[in-house]
Amino acid sequence: MKSALKKSILAVFMLCFATQAWAVKAKIRFLFPVSTKNVTDGFENAELRTSEFVLAFLLPVSRNTQLGLGYSYFNARIEDPTSSSEGYKGIFRAHLMELGAGYSGFELTRNISLLFDASVRIPVSGQAEVKGNQDSAEASSISGMGYFFGPGVAYGKMEIILFYQRRNLSFDNLTVLRKGKRQDVALHSTEYGLGLGYTF
């Protein structure tokens, strides 16, 4: 599916979702990984640094259950160790559509409740660039899948969540030259961390 078509489908879905009478809430969430396990094809000896935020429209299906349709922006950077002769640096950006559900029916007090969120993330578009001492490459076509879930605590409109997420993203025709051989570049990450959210 072409990138432009993916963007159009995402825009139509979010517009229709947001204009429904039920969709009276939106949520923004920032994710802060605490523990990560990353394997980046083509950068096996380097550490991937990531950041991400999520904006979602919420559709109540019952008093304590909500469906969510949202947008996730993912950004990552990676760099070869100084001992590497290739000297590659990589920048990756991805725009993902999020489909999920949340439950917040476990009330601890009048204003505090436990919640649980789960979602899948489908890449819609992305850009990536790798630069080395001898060559460089760019890509604007992305594929893969992501998963997210975790328990948390909601206090009024604020929430704190302990999350687990897994992400597998590949960029078409993005390669690096290692020991005279071309290697495809792809991101595989598992993260545990803290999420801060606000519903408005």
Label each PLM-derived region with a short phrase:
Residues W22-R77, G197-T199:
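Short glycine/proline- and aromatic-enriched beta-strand/turn motifs that initiate or cap beta-hairpins
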Residues L48-V54, A94-E98, I142-F148, S189-G193:
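Transmembrane beta-barrel architecture of outer-membrane proteins
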Residues F30-N38, Y71-R77, Y103-G105, V120-G126, ...:
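Transmembrane beta-strands of outer-membrane beta-barrel pores
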Residues P60-N64, F106-I112, Y155-I160:
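Outer-membrane beta-barrel channels and translocator barrels
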Residues V34-E47, S72-A94, V124-S143, S170-L187:
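Flexible, solvent-exposed loop segments that connect beta-strands
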Residues M1-K25:
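Cleavable N-terminal export/targeting peptides
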Residues D80, Y147-F200:
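Predominantly the C-terminal beta-signal and adjacent terminal strand-loop region
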Residues A26-F32, L67-Y71, L99-A101, F116-A118, ...:
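Membrane-embedded beta-strand positions of outer-membrane beta-barrel proteins
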